[in-house]
């Protein structure tokens, strides 16, 4: 089993149906702005994530530009998560698509 790649628009539509979007960017960038409703997935927050997500929950991984999210998506599949997606373009693509964001400013 592997992950699938989806566009930011597809990710947003899936989130409206209950998918979990995890943002793996660094603390400072996540705090400044991130996709609306995103969970900040870090080594420190992984246990909290495990409590939040079922193994069959749709999980979308977002990073800066859509590259490192593939590695985390692969890791999640290896951990037993069955419905994993990597978001093409990452947060940069999300912003270009003019999708909702939460910001600190």
UniProtKB/Swiss-Prot annotation:
It comes from Haemophilus influenzae (strain PittEE). It is an enzyme of class 2 (transferase). InterPro entries: GlpE_sulfurtransferase (IPR050229), Rhodanese-like_dom (IPR001763), Rhodanese-like_dom_sf (IPR036873), Thiosulf_sulfurTrfase (IPR023695). Transferase that catalyzes the transfer of sulfur from thiosulfate to thiophilic acceptors such as cyanide or dithiols. May function in a CysM-independent thiosulfate assimilation pathway by catalyzing the conversion of thiosulfate to sulfite, which can then be used for L-cysteine biosynthesis. HAMAP family: Thiosulf_sulfurtr (MF_01009). Keywords: Cytoplasm, Transferase. SUPFAM superfamilies: Rhodanese/Cell cycle control phosphatase (SSF52821). It catalyses: thiosulfate + hydrogen cyanide = thiocyanate + sulfite + 2 H(+); thiosulfate + [thioredoxin]-dithiol = [thioredoxin]-disulfide + hydrogen sulfide + sulfite + 2 H(+). GO terms for cellular component: cytoplasm. The active site is at residue 63. GO terms for molecular function: thiosulfate-cyanide sulfurtransferase activity. Its main location: cytoplasm. Gene3D superfamilies: Rhodanese-like domain (3.40.250.10). Its EC number is 2.8.1.1. It is found in: Cytoplasm. The keyword Cytoplasm applies. Belongs to the GlpE family. It holds the Pfam family Rhodanese. This is Thiosulfate sulfurtransferase GlpE. Transmembrane segments: none annotated. GO terms for biological process: glycerol metabolic process.
